Amino acid sequence: MFTQLITALSYRVFLSIFLSMRINTLTNMADPQLTKLIQDLTAIRSFAQRYSKIIRDARDYVIDAGKTGRTKLSEAEKAEKTIFGMKVEAYLRYEFAWGKGPKLDFYFNCIEFDSKATVGKTWMVPPEAVGELCLLTLLDEKRSVYSAGVIRASLTALTKGKNQDKKRSVSAIGKQSIHWLIKDELY
């Protein structure tokens, strides 16, 4: 009985990993623009180290420990957490000399893409970014790590429901299709 349970759990874990890999592979093969963006971003010199500094700087800007006494971003107000995402976007654009796209946050090597950052568990995608490429940043303060990945924000990668701003969140299936450029890196 116990062996069957372990086998069933192992099979589920294997299947989950396999499907995630297949989704990423199929998505990348069918989306040359996504593939090119992944290649271009991973080719940037010291990308992860520079990204880490951006995360620290944006976090420190919002926390403003000397004037607020805070030590964690989780202690900030909701509006201030939004500023974290705005600072990540601005610092990325400056650090990597990316242009501003006509519709989205960035324009780099002939590809336009949006920036989404979260200190929670998911990202909110506005209507103008649906169907577009997004650079996702995830901050995990409890473990002092961050992750950054790229996704095509297709309707299948997003939840059906929308908030009052008509933003959708990345769905469970969408999270499986994220191509992680940086995973659980210390900031």
What residues fall within each predicted segment?
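Nucleic-acid endonuclease domains
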Residues: 2-108, 117-187
